[in-house]
Regions:
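An N-cap/entry alpha-helix motif that binds or orients negatively charged groups
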Residues: 16-52
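Short, glycine/charged-enriched hinge/interface segments at domain edges or termini
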Residues: 2-8, 13, 18, 23-25, ...
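Short, basic and Ser/Thr-rich N-terminal targeting/leader segments
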Residues: 34-36, 42, 52-55, 89, ...
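Flexible glycine/proline-rich
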Residues: 24-29, 38, 51, 80, ...
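Helix-rich terminal scaffold detector
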Residues: 3-7, 167-294, 298-304, 315
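Alpha-helical scaffold segments in soluble metabolic enzymes
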Residues: 9, 13-16, 30, 34, ...
């Protein structure tokens, strides 16, 4: 097992261990936030017929060449109706937005360009050929790929798929994640801590991060600092695709997670990463399942989850690019660095008048300052090679995905 490896290498090792989960079929209305397991192709042309883009009149170009043009209005077509007749030369047909256009229509003149009274239309402006006509198949052709596999289903995608008659989609099932917080000092959130005890923040916090990342929590467990308790927690994780531990992977005599996992045959890839916060981070594979050992400090655990576990779950869901979105930003104030350690600084972000993303420290940067997770917009990545991070320095900014 390697120790104190670089952040970039550690993250790639985690991603390389991801196994894409299987598919399941869900109703369209339940697919928001899920990931497509297969491409979706259009069953029809969209729109399915030539339609009017405006309220107005269907006309032939030769009839409106000389202005003002005066034409009899011989019919009206509303959305949902079928034109009863062809547009004959020398006539106009009133059409509403979305209405099918009668055969013979060469353009639509919007209502703002003319007036109609007692069945006669006067046009003071002529449309160009095809103007204000939405052609059949203009948006999508039958058989055309609408959304590729690996796409996250958004509300906008739901509307598009509904318009194509898609009522059920194949999505990746949610990766099953077991979250285990460790420590004799932990009590439940509904309990009053006794002397030397604290409420468990890691279990509920990490479970929420799993859900926000598209996973399904199959257990939120607390393991005491005994081999028997850690063993019992591991035995309860058999259904999980991914195991996430908070605490128990450091060098203390009661950090028993590593020992118990090794007894069960885990293959460790690394232990300790050259980063801050989250230096005591461990990763391995047990029976083909990724095992991520996070620090016990809640801030360090939350940060490491976003940097490592969220991309891992995205890869398990089959996302083409599982890495979190990042962008360039500029520091408005100096930030502390640590020699040889990649630093994740909690920062606020705002754009100035010129469009530059300005980053400022979100208060104290200690790994015990849980409030900084709420007060910040994301993480500024300060490379391990930097001796200092001065105001004005350009850095990579990773916005919180929650």
């Amino acid at each position: 097992m390697r120790t104190l490896i670089a952040f970039e290498e550690a993250r790639q090792i985690v991603l390389d261990a991801a196994r894409v989960v299987g598919p399941e079929a869900v109703r369209l209305g339940d697919a928001v936030g899920r990931t497509l397991a297969a491409p979706v192709t259009s069953r029809d042309d969209l729109p399915p017929f030539d339609t009017s883009a405006m309220d107005g009149w269907a006309v032939r170009l030769g009839d409106v060449r000389d202005l003002p043009a005066v034409l009899p209005v011989v019919a009206t077509v509303h959305a949902g109706e079928v034109p009863a007749a062809t547009l004959a030369p020398g006539t106009a047909i009133a059409v509403m937005t979305g209405a099918p256009l009668p055969s013979g229509t060469e353009a639509v003149a919007p209502v703002e360009w003319g007036t109609a009274s007692e069945g006669r239309l006067r046009l003071d402006r002529a449309p160009e050929a095809g103007q204000f006509i939405r052609r059949r198949g203009e948006a999508l052709r039958e058989g055309e790929e609408v959304l590729p596999s690996g796409t996250a289903v958004t509300p906008g995608a739901i509307g598009l798929l509904a318009s194509l008659g898609v009522h059920e989609v194949a999505v990746r099932r949610r990766p099953r994640v077991a979250v285990v917080a460790t420590g004799d000092e932990l009590v439940g959130v509904d309990e009053a801590p006794g002397p030397g005890q604290i409420r468990d923040a890691n279990g509920p916090g990490l479970a929420a991060q799993v859900a926000a990342a598209g996973g399904a929590v199959v257990g939120t467990l607390v393991a005491r600092d005994t081999s028997a308790s850690v063993s019992a927690a591991l035995a309860a994780c058999t259904e999980a695709d991914v195991l996430v531990f908070a605490g128990g992977v450091s060098m203390g005599e009661r950090d028993l997670v590593r020992t118990e996992l090794e007894r069960r045959g885990v293959t460790w890839s690394f232990w300790k990463v050259a980063q801050r916060p989250g230096k005591p981070l461990a990763f391995g594979v047990l029976d083909g399942r990724p095992v991520l050992g996070l620090p016990g400090n809640p801030v360090s655990a939350a940060v490491c989850f976003e940097v490592y576990a969220r991309p891992l779950l995205s890869a398990c869901l089959g996302h083409a690019d599982p890495l979190p979105h990042s962008e360039a930003g500029r520091l408005d104030a100096a930030l502390p660095t640590a020699a040889g350690l990649h630093t994740f600084a909690r920062v606020t972000a705002r754009r100035d008048e010129s469009g530059v993303l300005r980053l400022r420290p979100a208060g104290a940067q200690g790994s015990h300052v849980a409030r900084s997770l709420l007060d910040s917009d994301g993480l500024a990545h300060l490379p391990a090679s930097w001796d200092a991070a001065e105001a004005g320095a350009e850095v990579t900014f990773q916005r919180w995905a929650w």
